[in-house]
Amino acid sequence: MNVLPCSINTLKGLYDISEVEVGQHFYWQIGGFQVHAQVLITSWVVIAILLGSAAIAVRNPQTIPTDGQNFFEYVLEFIRDLTKTQIGEEYGPWVPFIGTMFLFIFVSNWSGALLPRKIIQLPHGELAAPTNDINTTVALALLTSVAYFYAGLTKKGLGYFGKYIQPTPILLPINILEDFTKPLSLSFRLFGNILADELVVVVLVSLVPLVVPIPVMFLGLFTSGIQALIFATLAAAYIGESMEGHH
């Protein structure tokens, strides 16, 4: 007697999954350029959260820190220690860059997991983490590439390019290729992990909308934090490597 309703529910779940679309974007025309509006919206939300948190952190600091001040100081110390471990004693100027990368990616990843997808209706596509878009992750990876080239050239001048023929000129093509594989690996690792996590949650919510997706969502939060840490650690390691001149 209950076979037909169960079959209908199963078919409905499969139909909901068939509606999950990848690569659907809501576009804005800005100055003759076509931009992904949902990426800009969520990026602005992330930037607003970070700027608001920074304003709160520096407002009225106490000699005896409050719980909130302790939290912000812990975050700063964590970023400083991460940068120092990878870059070395000349880490100071790079703390803002590595910190910005880590915090932007961390909050972006969490925004995709915590921000209700249906709370804002868009003509096409849905809100998602900025790091769910390959354009964002490629831009972050290219910024990292510019940063480690700048670090190497600032430290060594034109002598920085001598690393391409070390330890032997035979490795010149491989060393040049490495400069292309670094941003590729950074961008695709971050993009793939965040996209896969959000798709898994969407599919599970379509099938079993109550209890089952919750553990996966918590796992996604953990994975999102790990991906931000990996990106920031590798960015700092590349900068330190360019300044030291060894692999």
UniProtKB/Swiss-Prot annotation:
GO molecular function, one term: proton-transporting ATP synthase activity, rotational mechanism
Membrane topology type: Multi-pass membrane protein
Chief site of localization: plastid
Record-linked SUPFAM superfamilies: F1F0 ATP synthase subunit A
Keyword Transport: yes
Transmembrane segments: 38-58, 95-115, 134-154, 199-219, 220-240
Keywords: ATP synthesis, CF(0), Chloroplast, Hydrogen ion transport, Ion transport, Membrane, Plastid, Thylakoid, Transmembrane, Transmembrane helix, Transport
Cross-referenced InterPro entries: ATP_syn_F0_a_bact/chloroplast, ATP_synth_F0_asu, ATP_synth_F0_asu_AS, F0_ATP_A_sf
Any single GO CC term annotated in Swiss-Prot or TrEMBL for this entry: proton-transporting ATP synthase complex
Cellular location(s): Plastid, Chloroplast thylakoid membrane
Source species, domain of life: Eukaryota
Assembly and oligomerization: F-type ATPases have 2 components, CF(1) - the catalytic core - and CF(0) - the membrane proton channel. CF(1) has five subunits: alpha(3), beta(3), gamma(1), delta(1), epsilon(1). CF(0) has four main subunits: a, b, b' and c.
HAMAP family the UniProt entry points to: ATP_synth_a_bact
The family this protein is said to belong to: Belongs to the ATPase A chain family.
Its job: Key component of the proton channel; it plays a direct role in the translocation of protons across the membrane.
Protein name: ATP synthase subunit a, chloroplastic
Organism: Calycanthus floridus var. glaucus
